[in-house]
Amino acid sequence: MKIDPKNGIADLIFGMKMTHVEHLLGEPDRQFHDEDDNVIYLYNKQKLRLTFYADEDLRFGYAITSYPNASLLGQAIIGKPVGEVIESLPFTTWETEDFDSVTNHFNESNWLTIQSEFGAIIRVEIGALIDDATDSFIWRFKG
């Protein structure tokens, strides 16, 4: 499963509607609304959580995965040492935040979070970018 910064994950492109995603992945294993009334799809086999933003016409805008073969810029990263992976990436600015045994490593320019526990990557979060000038999402999907 390819994590594609700024664009999406696997065959899913930021800006897709739920029908586009269902066409590619099928019905989700679970679906619910979060506290902001966004629609959340969970796909167990792919270890994938997708967010469709309520205030953006239910467009796909955020993904979380812990899929064992998830890759970022050509390298598998789940279970790998977080320090080695971050050093190997071309992204230079990272914000780090600790929560108990978990550490989030956030790169704002790619809206990418690499989450680690005990020094190993356990999941990756990626979101659609926001245009600073217009304060609106940059939707890569044009269909």
What are these regions (language model features)?
Residues 16-58, 71-72, 76-143:
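A cross-family detector of function-defining hotspots
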Residues 1-5:
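A short, surface-exposed helix-loop junction/capping segment
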Residues 6-11, 70-75:
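Short, recurring structural edge motifs at helix starts
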Residues 61-71:
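Helix-adjacent hinge/juxtasegments
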